[in-house]
């Protein structure tokens, strides 16, 4: 079997809600179709941007079923990580029948594991998984950073750990990862505004929030970077940069949902404990969207 190799733009899909906070499956299906038509390289349902902690088991399986049904052979990287081994394995068992190609597994949050604890946890997950795994390092949300040496150790010791989504915001750490990563191991940006730098250094792509809004443009930037066309990539980066920053004006996915609402693709509703975008964020995202489409 060929090893899965992730590269380019993977969209971390938002989960649309109706005005009464039910999952809007129709809007979700339309959003998935828009992603496919826009040329993204892979999709990432059930991750942070999808508000997965607020979803029921039935909602998770239905969202994954819809995604698989609509994307054909496009790779699906499904979020399944928790802060316990048993919880993560239970999510894998729940979701695997619905067709993911690989798992996105976050560094356990709240527990604050040491580097050795992180290594043992991911090795245990890898040994029990029938699908490839991408590590998700996002210390701003988890309270624990996976150092480059730990990620490389896992990449070398666990053949089915195939990549890492790196959202530490530390360029030195990302550079070390890229420099030492074994062949076929994908280093993916977890921050849209770091994608240009990460891919120019040798990384393979991005798991993007902004591509919910501008999938064709973010994909084109990644395509340019994969071809070492820095001139085109820089132009796209600068055009998209206000969107990259605006998507984090409040906790993700609050601003990106405001942007999607501006485009008429879904409501801006989020589930508690998140709250809808403030008036100032709505105004900001409206301006960003209007300016972005004016410059198209």
Task: Pin down the residues of each PLM region.
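Active-site beta->alpha loop and helix N-cap motifs at the rims of alpha/beta catalytic domains
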Residues: 2-143, 153
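Glycine-rich phosphate-binding "P-loop"
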Residues: 137-138, 160-161, 271-272
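Catalytic alpha/beta core domains of metabolic enzymes, predominantly
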Residues: 127-128, 141-248
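Short, well-ordered beta-to-alpha junction loops that form the rim of enzyme active sites
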Residues: 138, 167, 259
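A general structural signal for well-ordered alpha-helical segments in protein cores
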Residues: 28, 60, 64, 88, ...
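Structured C-terminal cap/extension of enzyme domains
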Residues: 23, 36, 197-296
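Gly/Ser/Thr-rich helix-start
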Residues: 9, 48-51, 80-82, 164, ...
